[in-house]
């Protein structure tokens, strides 16, 4: 029984490591340039192990982006909950985005269009993010930090 628990915790940790390694590689080289074999080699695991955990490259990309978005949102939420003003939180979101743009290979954004499941997720996430941003801006107006008549 102990062996099964260790195996499961190892697999869970490995799933996370795969997503981190894949996202770093995708952002650095572009999605099409990164092969599943590259990810497996980087983590010193077999391709078989990789394919036992994730069905294909699109699933790895999809899960990586979901994780990345969740972590970014958690970071901003934590920053906002630390008592920073609305303007400071907006600037932090801007800093995060600019850092991302600076670090990400432009091919990454072009390659995403070739993965329909991922493209759909990004569109849906963008809509939700925009709604949250507008609600946040409204909070800034209510606090008197932002002007209502500005678009």
Give residue spans per PLM region.
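Hydrophobic alpha-helical connector segments
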Residues: 63, 74-103
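Hydrophobic alpha-helical bundle segments that form small-molecule/ligand-binding pockets
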Residues: 127-151
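Short secondary-structure transition hinges
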Residues: 93-132
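A short secondary-structure junction motif
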Residues: 71, 100-104, 136, 140
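Amphipathic, non-transmembrane alpha-helical scaffold segments
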Residues: 11, 15, 65, 69, ...
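N-terminal intrinsically disordered/low-complexity leader segments
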Residues: 1-13
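Short coil/turn segments at alpha/beta junctions that flank glycine-rich nucleotide-binding fingerprints
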Residues: 28-32, 83, 143
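Helix-turn-helix
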Residues: 17, 21, 25-59, 63
